[in-house]
């Protein structure tokens, strides 16, 4: 019996040949821990300003499409377009995205940066879609986390409760949030977050539960359905004129929707 690396060719051999094959254990993949990866790579993005980090999040989808077109190199880091296996030290777009979110959350400890993030992130489409109120540092941290890889970020110390509470909220409110379960399984994501927490022996003690309840209270006050109502209110004067052409006065109705 021979042990081989897991590649396209070895999979073909596994399916078509009579000899016994086993794949080599990928120690890097098995032992991967984003907390360690974060500590080792966070300096790679230290030169990014807070505004630049926010620009990355706001344009995440467009940036991802460009980066994934070919091998993408910045500084000493290369994100490969294709790879047979992702090692524990390899940079990927998801890991880069998570690094930037961790960096931004850390920046909320500075009052000046907190105010900058608060004012800029309010215009991000995802924050508006969630109807998330940005009243304090905790709500801003939640805003930074929206759209991020919660299972990855949950491994970083002090990010456990914000990750698990947000995962629960997304699972509970996926319909209101417009999440397509075929594209993003919220239950699976929550399970992955809990698996990460269990693997690091995280204890949900009284202090952690208290912290989680604070995040849950903020999310409970958000209104995922508010975006359309706010937009309607913005055009209410003109919309009402068209309603009147149909013999209906809708000012009161628009106010109710808002």
Curated annotation (Swiss-Prot):
GO cellular component terms listed in the entry, alphabetical order: helical viral capsid; ribonucleoprotein complex; viral nucleocapsid
Compartments in which it is found: Virion
Pfam family for this entry, one: Tospo_nucleocap
InterPro entries assigned to the protein according to its UniProt record, in alphabetical order: Tospo_nucleocap
Keyword RNA-binding: yes
This protein's UniProt keywords: Capsid protein, Helical capsid protein, Ribonucleoprotein, RNA-binding, Viral nucleoprotein, Virion
Single GO MF annotation: RNA binding
Homology family: Belongs to the tospovirus nucleocapsid protein family.
Its job: Encapsidates the genome protecting it from nucleases. The encapsidated genomic RNA is termed the nucleocapsid (NC) and serves as template for transcription and replication. The NC have a helical organization.
Quaternary context: Homotrimer. Binds the viral genomic RNA.
Domains (record comment): The N-terminus and C-terminus are involved in homooligomerization and play an essential role in viral RNA synthesis.
Protein name, entry field: Nucleoprotein
Gene: N
